[in-house]
């Protein structure tokens, strides 16, 4: 039988992992991924008649994208063209997916499959600044909870909500691949890393002022270097021919 200490530890771990499982569900729900949410339901803001068309500039970009693939394989361009639609519109209504299918001459279902699989495609409107807080294990161990709590208090919204002025949307996401710089958040295309609650408040203040905060670590270190500085690769690499026998 488990000792009382082991039982308590197991209970604590179960609660912790249960919370993060719920967070994953929240992320999936917000992005329109998972389970029954693969089924589209028309709403006043998201239906086949929702106005959407690419700009002339983006039609030219699509032509350039399609040329990267062999003739007859334009379906390979679904991901980048969906991304282009989202960058133009801010999110992907079903009408945008239909337009992508029309432009690439593929069945609409092929586009729906992609748009519902990747959570990076936003199937509901988001704010001008889409704040994605990583709460996976490495960030959690580096106190990402305090970052999330600070954002909720600062913005006056909960996870999955958008501020009334449509400026900020806040969601939780799974690993963003910057574990060595935990805790971190992604805001639109930029990573902000090595965060403290004070850092994230300053970032929000800059965004509210119309500025673009400098992305990357806030701790002063370069990229993902060790906090104490480099311990290897401390000098420029040797030139061509280094270590090669003179007769070769």
UniProtKB/Swiss-Prot annotation:
InterPro entries to which the protein is assigned, alphabetical: NuoE-like, NuoE_dom, NuoE_N, Thioredoxin-like_sf
Compartmental location: Mitochondrion inner membrane
GO molecular function, one term: NADH dehydrogenase (ubiquinone) activity
Known EC number: 7.1.1.2
Domain of life (superkingdom): Eukaryota
Region Disordered, residue ranges: 229-248
FT transit peptide: 1-31
Sequence positions that bind [2Fe-2S] cluster: 134, 139, 175, 179
Gene3D superfamilies reported in the protein's UniProt record: Glutaredoxin, NADH-quinone oxidoreductase subunit E
One GO location term (cellular component): mitochondrion
N6-acetyllysine: residues bearing it: 60
Protein family (similarity comment): Belongs to the complex I 24 kDa subunit family.
The name this protein goes by in its record: NADH dehydrogenase [ubiquinone] flavoprotein 2, mitochondrial
């Amino acid at each position: 039988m488990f000792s009382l200490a082991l039982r308590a530890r197991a209970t604590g771990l179960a609660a912790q992992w249960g919370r993060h499982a719920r967070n994953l569900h929240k992320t999936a729900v917000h992005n329109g991924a998972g389970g029954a949410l693969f089924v589209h339901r028309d709403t006043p803001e998201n239906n086949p008649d929702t106005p959407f068309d690419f700009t002339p500039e983006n039609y030219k970009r699509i032509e350039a994208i399609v040329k990267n693939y062999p003739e007859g394989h334009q379906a390979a361009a679904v991901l980048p063209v969906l991304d282009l639609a989202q960058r133009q519109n801010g999110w992907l209504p079903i009408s945008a997916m239909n337009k992508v299918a029309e432009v690439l001459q593929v069945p609409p279902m092929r586009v729906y499959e992609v748009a519902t699989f990747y959570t990076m495609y936003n199937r509901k409107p988001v704010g001008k600044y889409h704040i994605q807080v990583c709460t996976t294990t490495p960030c959690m161990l580096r106190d990402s909870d305090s970052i999330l709590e600070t954002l909720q208090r600062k913005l006056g919204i909960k996870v999955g909500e958008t501020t009334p002025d449509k400026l900020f949307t806040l969601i939780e996401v799974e690993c963003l691949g910057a574990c060595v710089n935990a805790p971190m958040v992604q805001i639109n295309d930029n990573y902000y890393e090595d965060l403290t609650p004070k850092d994230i408040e300053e970032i929000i203040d800059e965004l509210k002022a119309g500025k673009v905060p400098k992305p990357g670590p806030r701790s002063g270190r370069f990229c993902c270097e060790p906090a104490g500085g480099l311990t290897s690769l401390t000098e420029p690499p040797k030139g061509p021919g280094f270590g090669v026998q003179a007769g070769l």
